[in-house]
A protein has these predicted regions:
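Alpha-helical membrane-interface segments at transmembrane helix boundaries
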Residues: 2-11, 94-118, 144-156
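Hydrophobic membrane-targeting segments
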Residues: 1-44, 171
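Acidic-residue sensor for enzyme active/binding pockets
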Residues: 31, 153, 187
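Lipid-exposed faces of alpha-helical membrane segments in multi-pass integral membrane proteins
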Residues: 17-30, 114-124, 160-164
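Residue-level signature of catalytic and energy-coupling elements of molecular machines
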Residues: 12, 26, 61, 76, ...
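Predominantly long cytosolic amphipathic alpha-helical stalk/bundle segments
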Residues: 39-124, 128-139, 171-202
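Pore-lining and gate-forming transmembrane alpha-helices of multi-pass membrane transport proteins
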Residues: 145, 149-172, 176
């Protein structure tokens, strides 16, 4: 821990915004993980729901949606209660899908910003540190001293910035992939429900 604190101070003032970025990445990752876990109805639900609708077992599909957690299951269960016909259901599904996708994308832009910003902050810290290292001169001989050590310390900021960026990139890629899977499952369920409504003549 003491060595970590020592490196932190050697990295310069830019280490503070990098620390804030790393804390933000961890906080966003935890919040998004819990949100996705709560809102994801799961691929098995989507597959079973579509299978039941294609088999014209609409009541069983409705009961499955009612008994399943997650936003996708809730939306299709609510849509099945609409009695005005297919067009009303379609409008409801589209509006709810837009709201849900916006919720899924929430805070992911922050991770993307940190991916780009962290290496730049690290580079800035390194440049400032190198300027400081090259400005040190031995007043007696006129020769620069401690330049190598100064550059080594300055590179701490770049290394830290890259680590934060990699962490943020991994988190962003994971949640973007999971979001794509959830959207795909949702679209499959919506299509199956609308096809079932078409077959029923509503």
């Amino acid at each position: 821990i003491q060595q970590t604190i020592m490196y932190f101070h050697k990295g310069g003032l830019v280490m503070w915004p990098l620390l804030f970025c790393s804390i933000a990445v961890i906080a966003i990752a935890i919040e998004r993980f819990l949100f996705y876990k709560a809102e994801d109805s799961g691929q098995p639900f989507a597959a079973k729901y579509c299978e039941l609708l294609r088999a014209n077992e609409r009541e069983e599909a409705f009961q499955l949606a009612e008994a399943t957690n997650g936003e996708c299951a809730k939306i299709v269960a609510d849509a099945a209660k609409i009695t005005e016909g297919r067009e009303q259901q379609k409008a409801f599904l589209e509006s709810q899908a837009g709201i849900f996708i916006a919720k899924l994308k929430n805070k992911l832009d922050y991770l993307a910003i940190i991916v780009t910003m962290s290496p730049l902050l690290g580079l800035l810290g390194t440049i400032v540190g190198m300027i400081g290292a090259f400005s040190i001169f031995n007043l007696e001989s006129g020769a620069p001293i401690a330049i190598t050590g100064g550059i080594g310390e300055a590179l701490i900021a770049t290394a830290t910035g890259l680590c934060v960026a990699i962490l943020s990139l991994c988190a962003h890629s994971y949640f973007a992939h999971r979001m794509d899977n959830m959207i795909t499952d949702m679209e499959q369920c919506f299509s199956a429900l609308l096809e079932a409504e078409t077959r029923s003549g509503k």
